[in-house]
Amino acid sequence: MKLAHLSLFLLALHLSSSRSPSASDLPQEELVDQKCLLQKYTHRSCNKVFCQPWQRCIEGTCICKLPYQCPRAGTPVCAMNGRSYPTYCHQKSFECLHPEIKFSHNGTCAAEGKFNVSLIYGRTKTEGLVQVKLVDQDERMFICKNSWSMAEANVACVDLGFPLGVRDIQGSFNISGNLHINDTECLHVHCRGVETSLAECAFTKRRTELSNGLAGVVCYKQDADFPTSLSFQCVNGKHIPQEKACNGVNDCGDQSDELCCKGCRGNASLCKSGVCIPDQYKCNGEVDCITGEDESRCEEDRQQNIPKGLARSAQGEAEIETEETEMLTPGMDNERKRIKSLLPKLSCGVKRNTHTRRKRVIGGKPANVGDYPWQVAIKDGQRITCGGIYIGGCWILTAAHCVRPSRAHSYQVWTALLDWLKPNSQLGIQTVKRVIVHEKYNGATFQNDIALIEMKMHTGKKECELPNSVPACVPWSPYLFQPNDRCIISGWGRGKDNQKVYSLRWGEVDLIGNCSQFYPDRYYEKEMQCAGTRDGSIDACKGDSGGPLVCEDINNVTYVWGIVSWGENCGKPEFPGVYTRVANYFDWISYHVGRSLVSQHNV
C-alpha cells in the first residue's frame, strides 16, 4: 500500500515538472484550459490581469473606483457630456460608474465640435467602412486598412453601441462608385484595446504607399451566430472560431479567449499565469503578465539584438511606414501608464541584505541573520509553539490551530530569532494585542487554517517598530505560482527522527498540484497547497506550524504562498506537507489589516 502511495507521489511530481507546452506541442482543442474556463475569467478578473488605474480589485473582480480615489496630478479632459474632469483617471472612473459618459478629448470643453465615429456603405447598421470626425477637424475621414486590427475594431464597435465588439474586419461593403479617395488621405489609428471610445486612441495622418484600402468592420450582434462544435464561447456570450482562442488577440472583446491557455499560437507569448499576450507587449516598459516575466531579462535581450515591442504583429498591427506627417491626437495610453505610476507602491518581500544563494542541502540548513526576515516565532508561556509570518505594520500571519483569541495576553512574538537557546542581538520581543481566527476555521478538517495576530505598539509610538524584520508580500492571485515551482519552508520544528531543533532551519520544496490522491476526502484544493520533495528529506514537521512556505517571483520578490498547516508522517515522501493557500484569503486578510498594507497592485 505504501509503495502505491509513493508511486502516486512521484507521478504527481513528474507531471508537475513537465515544461509548459508551446502551441505546436498541443492539438488545437487542448490549447485551452477547460478547468480554468469554468471560472469565467474576463478583462475584469484580477486573478488573471491587472486592473485599470481607475479600478480596484475586490474579491477577484476589478470594480470602479470613486473619482476621489484617483491621483490628483494630471491635466483636464473633456467628456462627451460637455463636462470637464480634473484628470483622465477621474473621467474614466466616472465613466466606469456611468458608461454613457465617454471620453471626448484632452483639455477643457472649450473646443468646438465633438468626436464622432460612424459606419458607411454597409448593408446593415452593424457594418461598413469606418469614418471619424476628430474634435476641431471640419471633415470626416476614413481609417487606413493597414493600421486596423482587432484592437481598434473592438473599440470602434463598443463606441458605436455594440458591447460585444467586432465580428469581422474583412467585410464586403457596397462602396459607391462616386468614392474617389487617395489612400494617403486616410488616418492611421492605434488603440491598446482597453479603450471604450476611438477618441482615446492615437490618430496620425501619414503619407504612405503601403496602404491597401480602407478599414471596415462588422460589429457583433447578440443573435449573430449559433454555437458549433468548432466555436469558442466567450464569457460575454459571443462565439468566435475555436482557432482564434489563445492567439494573443482579444477576439472576444472581454479577453476571455486569452485567459485560460496552456500554450499560445501565432505571435503571442504565454504568461506563467496561463494568459496569452501579444509578442509586442514583451519588454515594452509595462508589466502585462501578473507574474512579471514579460519585463524580465529585457536588457539581456537588447544586448543580443532581439527587437521586442518595436513592430506590431501580423494580426492587423501597423506596418513600418516610410514617411510620417502630423500627429492629430496622441491617444491616452501614455496617460494611462502615467496614472499607474502614480498609484501607491508597497515595499515587501525584498531582503535588506543579499546572501549568496546556497545549493540545496538534504535535510535543510541553519539560517543566517537576514535570510528570512519575515519569519517570527510565537511563544506561549515558556515554549515556542509555532511559527508565523510578518506581513507589515503590526500584523503576523499564522495558522488558526496555533492560537486562541482568549489567550492573546499570553503570547509573545519573537522577531529575527535564529536560535532560541542562544538569543541573538537582533532579537525583538513583541506583546500581542489581539488574535483573529478565521470565522470558518474547522479544527477537525483544518479548513480555513489561518489566523492573524496584531502586536501591541510600544508606548508613545504610532506604529510597530521591527527594525530587523521585512514583511513578506501577500499574494492576491492563485496563479502567481504553479505546480513544480521551487519554494522555501523555514522553522524550528522537529528534525530527523523527531529530534528537537533549536536553530531556525530552511529547506527547498516543490509545489505539488491536487493532493486528493494522497489525502482522499481531506484535501480541499481551493484552500490548501501541497509541497514536498521526491525523497521526503525536506518537510515541515511538528513545531513548524504557522510558519511560512514562501516563493520568489521572477524579480526575486518573496510571497507567503502557504502557512504550515498539517500532514502525516513527517519526512515520508508519500505524505507531502499541506499548507494553507494564502492567496485564497487575500480579501479576508486585507479586510482586517487594511488594503493599503498588503495590496501591491490594483489599489
UniProtKB/Swiss-Prot annotation:
Covalent S-S links between cysteines: C36-C260, C46-C57, C51-C62, C64-C96, C70-C89, C78-C109, C144-C186, C157-C219, C191-C201, C234-C252, C246-C261, C264-C276, C271-C289, C283-C298, C348-C473, C386-C402, C394-C464, C487-C551, C515-C530, C541-C570
Entry GO terms, CC: extracellular space; membrane
Lineage, broadest ranks: Eukaryota, Metazoa, Chordata, Craniata, Vertebrata
Keywords from the UniProt entry: Calcium, Cleavage on pair of basic residues, Complement pathway, Disulfide bond, Glycoprotein, Hydrolase, Immunity, Innate immunity, Metal-binding, Protease, Repeat, Secreted, Serine protease, Signal
Similarity comment text for this entry: Belongs to the peptidase S1 family.
Species whose genome carries this gene: Mus musculus (Mouse)
Database matches in Pfam families: CFAI_FIMAC_N, Kazal_CFAI, Ldl_recept_a, SRCR, Trypsin
Keyword Cytoplasm appears in the UniProt entry: no
Record-annotated Peptidase S1 domain positions: 361-594
Entry's transmembrane regions: none
Gene null: resulting phenotype: CFI-deficient mice are viable and fertile under specific pathogen-free conditions. In the absence of factor I/CFI, physiological cleavage of the alpha-chain of C3b is prevented, and reduced plasma C3, factor B, and factor H levels are observed.
Keyword Repeat: yes
Sequence ranges assigned to domain Kazal-like in this UniProt record: 58-111
Coiled-coil ranges per UniProt: none
Compartments, as annotated in UniProt: Secreted, Extracellular space
Protein name, UniProt field: Complement factor I
